[in-house]
Amino acid sequence: MDFYYLPGSAPCRAVQMTAAAVGVELNLKLTDLMKGEHMKPEFLKINPQHCIPTLVDNGFALWESRAICTYLAEKYGKDDKLYPKDPQKRAVVNQRMYFDMGTLYQRFADYYYPQIFAKQPANPENEQKMKDAVGFLNSFLDGHKYVAGDSLTIADLSILATISTYDVAGFDLAKYQHVAAWYENIRKEAPGAAINQAGIEEFKKYFEK
């Protein structure tokens, strides 16, 4: 199973943790966006959207990390704990995944990426939106050990990849009691946690320049 990725990428790390959780071995194919490797004709044949992560499972190509995570959990999961079959439980997992994609991760990117990649000054409005997003997550976790209920799901893995990226960026998670407690636990409990840690160390370099 080929996996086109960058180790520092939060979406890529989410997939790697999910693969670890279901016991799938990935054939890692480092894809350097800075060198334009995602624009090579052979990669465009696989993924015309030319983005990572991209998974190829016996000829079946899929991209968008959360779609890949649900695919791996459904096809290779030994049970439905990671991605429950119960419609309401699954709906909550989906909501958290979409929240991560559209709000939590997106607002991190909106605030930090212009500073990192375009050397622009910090935008206070985007900073507040980012803080609001972590506040929403804090509310979700009030009274719960995991982000989508009472057991670890792929939503925890996806959001761990994002929140650990917040952490290495220097965002103060201590102000969000439930997020901080969840993060302290999940970074030890999550399958593939060591892979995630190695990846965020790679991403951390962007904040040391």
UniProtKB/Swiss-Prot annotation:
GO MF annotation terms: DDT-dehydrochlorinase activity; glutathione transferase activity
Key words, A-Z: Lyase, Transferase
InterPro entries the record matches: Glutathione-S-Trfase_C-like (IPR010987), Glutathione-S-Trfase_C_sf (IPR036282), Glutathione_S-Trfase (IPR040079), Glutathione_S-Trfase_N (IPR004045), GST_C (IPR004046), Thioredoxin-like_sf (IPR036249)
Pfam family, one: GST_C
Stored Gene3D superfamilies: 1.20.1050.10, Glutaredoxin
Domain of life: Eukaryota
CDD domains: GST_C_Delta_Epsilon, GST_N_Delta_Epsilon
Reactions this protein catalyses: RX + glutathione = an S-substituted glutathione + a halide anion + H(+); 1,1,1-trichloro-2,2-bis(4-chlorophenyl)ethane = 1,1-dichloro-2,2-bis(4-chlorophenyl)ethylene + chloride + H(+)
Domain spans labelled GST N-terminal: 1-80
Cystine connections: none
Record-annotated GST C-terminal domain positions: 86-207
Chain residues that bind glutathione: S9, H50, C51, I52, E64, S65, R66
Entry EC number(s): 2.5.1.18, 4.5.1.1
Subunit field text: Homodimer.
Known role: Conjugation of reduced glutathione to a wide number of exogenous and endogenous hydrophobic electrophiles. Has DDT dehydrochlorinase activity.
Family: Belongs to the GST superfamily. Theta family.
Name assigned to this protein: Glutathione S-transferase 1, isoform C
